[in-house]
From Swiss-Prot:
Residues 138-230 have a biased composition (Low complexity). This is Non-specific lipid transfer protein GPI-anchored 23. It comes from Arabidopsis thaliana. One of its GO terms (biological process) is lipid transport. Glycans are attached at N41. Residues 125-230 are annotated as: Disordered. The gene is LTPG23.
Amino acid sequence: MKPSFVLLSIVLLLSSSLSDAADFGSPSQPPSMAPTPQPSNSTDCSSVIYSMVDCLSFLTVGSTDPSPTKTCCVGVKTVLNYSPKCLCSALESSREMGFVLDDTKALAMPKICNVPIDPNCDVSTPAASTPVSPPVESPTTSPSSAKSPAITPSSPAVSHSPPPVRHSSPPVSHSSPPVSHSSPPTSRSSPAVSHSSPVVAASSPVKAVSSSTASSPRAASPSPSPSPSISSSGILLVSKLFIAVVMVSSFLYILA
């Protein structure tokens, strides 16, 4: 609310200064012939403008209010019913005092508030559009300056040739250590196995008797002492024959 009161006070001072300047500018005219309507109208506009204080929150540039308040519309209707020019003077005074108002919204206030009165304000489009338009940027980002940091695409030459690879592998010696295939000499001489089986015992008793009688002298006779030159195979054969004879004799003894 402080900006609104400041605005109203400055408007009052401005209107009073305008009235004083008008009175001071025409000293030669008689007092009875002086045109008093303009000073009275400006003074009256300054007094009527107070009713539009609630419209500042809607008319200020950057305001987020979707619509004016009911009190604002009542004040606009009061100003327009008194004099449509008062709305125009209010816009001019606010622009001179540094207040940034949206002239498009201000001129559309009669339609927004459903007041069928057109103020017909002569508002220049540049002054009305300067608060809304974005600030003009200085031509700092010119194409030449944008391209000033020239990027040198030339990079240091990279040698794509790979280093020579040595394919020579260390010589592999395929010569294996000599394997001795000579196996230790195995003695293939096996002891003589007597194939004589005790089948002799199954022969007829006549043959058994004859064999026993034939072999008895041998059994009775002392066996010669084995000489050191007799091989082990001979000793084994003799032992087997001796066992066979003993078995046959025992078998014959049982039969007898």
